[in-house]
UniProtKB/Swiss-Prot annotation:
SMART domains: Semialdhyde_dh. It comes from Brucella suis (strain ATCC 23445 / NCTC 10510). One of its GO terms (cellular component) is cytoplasm. The keyword Transmembrane does not apply. SUPFAM superfamilies: Glyceraldehyde-3-phosphate dehydrogenase-like, C-terminal domain, NAD(P)-binding Rossmann-fold domains. This is N-acetyl-gamma-glutamyl-phosphate reductase.
């Protein structure tokens, strides 16, 4: 019997992307609630309970409600793409490449919290350095990032694309989260193994999909004042054998005149770069990904596959 997959919120940006990814799969049965009935709580509960895996593509409060509808129905496993459970100790963090054994934790879990798009890039850069002992736990980490506007969901998409929208945004790039209270920070701090709350400055560009995340560091403040090659080697070793995360060779990175945020749009991979100059003792770690790929829908499907033993 084919496993049943229910995408609760399949008509939203992330849900639609997941539905598209599963459309050609003949090894699954995707069960869908009619769009007109998506607010029917009792019917949603029936679909949730009928599924082998429920993928929640909902706002935080709605995700919490969906989880509550499954209380006492432990046969349904859950992947939550919201922020609601990413720092909850009972939920496996759905970043398969996070550390050794994480794939197995996801595969065996009933509850999986899909990572946020920005934290995916930032944690991919920070966590290996923490685990290797290069990055002190109390280092004052700063994360700068730009995302495609689809990361803001249907409302922001309309504001960026519809010139007749009452709140149309003409800006080609804008900063937000200005008070430094972005909801992704607790996740970034916990799974990045940081003692100090990192500074996170996100922005949105006038392009649909894509993302660049930057973590600049002073080499002299890292353990042993490592070289660029050493930092690169730590990342390379951490992601050795991974087919989704690619650490770009140092020599190749040194020849690049620029990094295009849209390079991986529509793809589920992630590229990591090490830039900098040892003359000034500075390194800039960069992650390149699709905010809707490895940053959302692609990761959800990857986690689903792991949970199904695929």
């Amino acid at each position: 019997m084919k496993p049943k997959i229910f995408i609760d919120g399949e008509h939203g940006t992330t849900g639609l992307q997941i539905r598209t990814r599963l459309a050609e799969r003949d090894d699954l049965e995707v069960i869908s609630i009619p769009e007109a009935e998506r607010r029917n709580k009792d019917l949603r509960a029936d679909y949730l309970r009928a599924a082998d895996i429920a993928i929640l593509c909902l706002p935080d409060d709605a995700s919490k409600e969906a989880v509550s509808l499954l209380e006492g129905h432990n046969s349904t496993r859950i992947i939550d793409t919201s922020t609601a459970h990413r720092v909850h100790p009972d939920w496996a963090y759905g970043f398969a490449e996070l550390t050794k054994g994480q794939r197995e934790r996801i595969a065996e879990a009933r509850l999986v919290a899909n990572p946020g798009c920005y934290p995916t890039g930032a944690i991919a850069l920070v966590r290996p350095l923490r685990d290797a002992g290069l990055l002190p736990a109390d280092y004052p980490v700063s994360v700068n990032a730009v995302s495609g506007y689809t990361g803001g969901g249907k409302q922001l998409i309309a504001q960026m694309e519809d010139r007749n929208h009452p709140d149309y945004l003409a800006a080609n790039n804008f900063l937000y989260g200005l008070p430094l209270k972005h909801k992704h920070v607790p996740e970034l701090q916990l799974h990045g193994r940081l003692d100090r709350r990192p500074i996170f400055s996100p922005s949105v560009g006038r392009f649909p999909q894509g993302m660049i995340v930057q973590v600049p560091l002073f080499l002299s403040e890292l353990e042993g004042s490592p070289s660029l090659a050493k930092v690169h080697a730590v990342l390379t070793e951490h992601y050795a054998g991974q087919d989704i995360v690619d650490v770009v060779p140092l020599e190749e990175s040194a020849k690049l005149p620029r990094v295009d945020a849209e390079e991986l749009a529509g793809k589920d991979g992630m590229k990591l770069f090490v830039f900098g100059t040892e003359d000034h003792g500075q390194v800039n770690l960069v992650a390149l990904l699709d905010n809707l790929g490895k940053g959302a829908s692609g990761a959800a499907v990857q986690n689903m596959n792991l949970m199904l033993g695929k």
